[in-house]
């Protein structure tokens, strides 16, 4: 017989916070140089014109302009920033 009640499951009680990944600026939105457009793990979305790729795969604007999401071939996506006309 056990001398203590089954308290157990102390290995379960944790729930880590989300990492806030995803789209920060949407298509058609105006951005300034340096604004973060997309946070991701790996190149879910590739950098297009006037968009930089950080070491953690963050996509950011290199110039001031308007965000545009585009296709890159059949099964890839890219995001570009075009100067506002």
Swiss-Prot record:
Origin species: Geotalea daltonii (strain DSM 22248 / JCM 15807 / FRC-32)
GO BP, one annotated term: translation
Family: Belongs to the bacterial ribosomal protein bL27 family.
Cross-referenced InterPro entries: Ribosomal_bL27
Entry keyword set: Ribonucleoprotein, Ribosomal protein
Protein name: Large ribosomal subunit protein bL27
Pfam families: Ribosomal_L27
Region (Disordered): 1-24
Gene Ontology cellular component annotations, sorted alphabetically: cytosolic large ribosomal subunit
GO molecular function ontology, one term from the record: structural constituent of ribosome
Endpoints of the signal sequence: none
Domain of life where this protein originates: Bacteria
């Amino acid at each position: 017989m056990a001398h203590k009640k089954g308290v157990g499951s102390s290995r379960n009680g944790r729930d880590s916070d989300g990492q806030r990944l995803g789209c920060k600026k949407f298509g058609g939105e105006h951005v300034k140089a340096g604004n973060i457009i997309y946070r991701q793990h790996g190149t879910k979305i590739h950098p297009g014109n006037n968009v930089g790729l950080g070491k953690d795969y963050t996509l950011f604007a290199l110039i001031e302009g308007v965000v545009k999401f585009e296709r890159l071939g059949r099964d890839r996506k890219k995001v570009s920033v075009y100067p506002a006309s």
